[in-house]
Amino acid sequence: MSENIQSVRGMNDCLPDAADAWQGFEAIVRDWLRRYGYREMRTPILEHTGLFKRAIGEVTDIVEKEMYTFVDELNGESLTLRPEGTASSVRAVIQHNLLYDGGKRLWYSGPMFRHERPQKGRYRQFHQVGVEALGFAGPDVDAELIVMCADLWRELGIAPTLQLNTLGDHGARQRHRSKLIAYYEAHRDVLDADAQRRLHSNPLRILDSKNPAMQALNAEAPRLLDELEDEALNHFDALQGLLRANGIAFEINPRLVRGLDYYNRTVFEWVTDQLGAQGTVCAGGRYDGLVEQLGGKPAPAAGFAMGIERLLALVETSGKPIVPAVPDAYIVHAGDTADAFAWQAAATLRGAGLAVVLHCGGGSFKSQMKKADASRARYAVIIGDEEAAAQQVSVKPLRGTAEQTRVELALAIEYLKKA
């Protein structure tokens, strides 16, 4: 016997029970985004490597360590499986000139790929829902992004904590960068290897260190908030006012910098400790320079992305798991006339919008009823030769104590829809 081939480590199959929960989540998300006026866009999972190097930053963990990159043997191009969705979205917006008539509210969903060490809630293929608001410069759209997240959390029955910061504008970041380098140079003897490597190339990333020893050093590091110019400070103050007016609680975290270089001004994360170690379930902010950086005309932009696997795990801990859709009916049938009529009945019920499983494989009524119950359908629609001859069906509730009833096929539609 040949050896079984397993899935790639960190890339998981989504089996039917899990897929049911995913579909329920996706239906909630689609309706939520529709209510806020966001429109879906879909981009390829494979992009030119240069897109991510330019957008995310070459001195980042994602680009340096985590991307799945290969050379296309046909033409020698370097290609990468997308590690995140914003760069691809902005590339598509520029390529198709979507901002020609004003701002756009867009969203995407799909798999992303990072070569990380697999662990709970962190996989090499993972899935995100992302939102991009392009062409809007004010703090009001920043607030909208955060408020809409809070609305979704309420609908899902979860309560992550909002952490908020601002990265200011270019001048503030440059002044802060100089002070960070001087600070860390003065403590060079206690810097870990990663901080030593980033000291002159990207010192802001040191603030994002997960090393406890570095976190203690970072607690005393110069604050970017102290370097803000009036315009950026007013933007941040206005955002906080809008959040308070909408009843959104938040914590200011001056060490929150995000792991991608394209962010400026507002950055935020929704975090939880309900999945063990504190983890981020949603993160975003402004990236006003990214459109121009990728070759488009200058345009402000903001957005966020949320991890579907982590959100579903968090929903499971809330005590309000997403209830998957189940079939409306399972058709049980036996007898030559009944078998033929069962096909007609299934087509009629499905044509009326009902979800129907038609039993296949024969067997006794008893064995078929066991399969009907296992299907989690709400009703068994039972057809014997006697029912078929009369163009009728027997409808038996599989949940609760209601009695079985026999009705005309046309009436069965109304019966199943009302129940």
Curated annotation (Swiss-Prot):
PROSITE patterns: AA_TRNA_LIGASE_II. Its EC number is 6.1.1.21. Keywords: Aminoacyl-tRNA synthetase, ATP-binding, Cytoplasm, Ligase, Nucleotide-binding, Protein biosynthesis. The keyword ATP-binding applies. It catalyses: tRNA(His) + L-histidine + ATP = L-histidyl-tRNA(His) + AMP + diphosphate + H(+). It is found in: Cytoplasm. Its main location: cytoplasm. It comes from the Bacteria. Coiled coil: none annotated. It is an enzyme of class 6 (ligase). One of its GO terms (molecular function) is histidine-tRNA ligase activity. One of its GO terms (biological process) is histidyl-tRNA aminoacylation. One of its GO terms (cellular component) is cytoplasm. NCBIfam families: hisS. Homodimer. Belongs to the class-II aminoacyl-tRNA synthetase family. This is Histidine--tRNA ligase. It comes from Thiobacillus denitrificans (strain ATCC 25259 / T1). The lineage of its organism: Bacteria, Pseudomonadati, Pseudomonadota, Betaproteobacteria, Nitrosomonadales.
